[in-house]
């Protein structure tokens, strides 16, 4: 970690490698929280203070992501970094940015659709009106944890509603998932069910299955709603 950190700037974190060379990213990348999150877990396991210092430094690089919302990925980015920092250290300086990020995520929630918006409309995807991807299930943990901290019920309500609506529309009878379900934002009507990263529109996307298993297991842990546990078990089979 220490050697890798030497190749980073004040605003970048590792994203991947290409031909053995580190590929960094800015904080706006959806994976930006994974590096500080990995550092926090390593510190938790080892107690190494140098690792803790790296975790603190790289968590702070994501502060801007607690103040603006670019997409649903704010959950990945902030829960992995600020969420783990707060959970592991108990340092109150991480509390308000974490809670603020959760409230920002709720601004992407459309009560008519019953879901948080994944991607903003763009020239790349002009045919989608209100795309929601199964990945969003991973980002609900930001809401449930923030609800524990601040007690604002709307955070948990959004998480519940999103999970229930996803359960209704994003699964086939055999509990495989559609990657993308596009909605009409004014009515909540389903427009299409497709893939964006999987093999085909009708195939099971392995990563999507994992997102669903984690998301519904987490929702059961936080709410004790047995319907969530049953969903996680069915998806995992």
State what each model feature region is.
Residues 1-237:
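Glycan-recognition and catalytic cores of secretory/periplasmic carbohydrate-active enzymes
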């Amino acid at each position: 970690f220490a050697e890798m950190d030497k190749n980073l700037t004040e605003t970048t974190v590792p994203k991947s490698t290409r031909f053995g060379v580190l590929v960094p990213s800015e904080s706006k990348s959806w994976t930006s929280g994974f590096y500080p999150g990995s550092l926090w877990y390593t510190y938790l396991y080892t107690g190494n203070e140098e690792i803790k210092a790296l975790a603190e430094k790289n968590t702070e690089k994501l502060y801007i992501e607690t103040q603006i919302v670019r997409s649903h990925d704010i959950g990945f980015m902030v829960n992995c970094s600020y969420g783990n920092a707060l959970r592991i250290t108990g340092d109150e300086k991480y509390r308000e940015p974490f809670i603020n990020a959760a409230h920002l995520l709720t601004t992407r929630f459309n009560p008519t659709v019953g879901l948080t918006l994944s991607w903003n409309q763009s020239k790349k995807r002009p045919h989608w009106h209100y795309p929601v991807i199964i990945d969003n299930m991973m980002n609900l943990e930001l809401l449930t944890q923030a609800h524990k901290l601040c007690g604002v019920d709307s955070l948990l309500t959004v998480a519940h509603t999103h999970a229930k609506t996803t359960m209704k529309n994003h699964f086939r009878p055999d509990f495989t998932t559609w990657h993308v379900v596009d909605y009409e934002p004014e009515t909540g009507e389903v427009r299409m069910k497709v893939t964006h990263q999987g093999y085909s529109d009708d195939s099971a996307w392995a990563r999507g299955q994992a997102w669903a298993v984690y998301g519904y297991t987490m929702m059961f842990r936080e709410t004790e709603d047995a319907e969530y546990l049953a969903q996680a078990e069915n998806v995992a089979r």
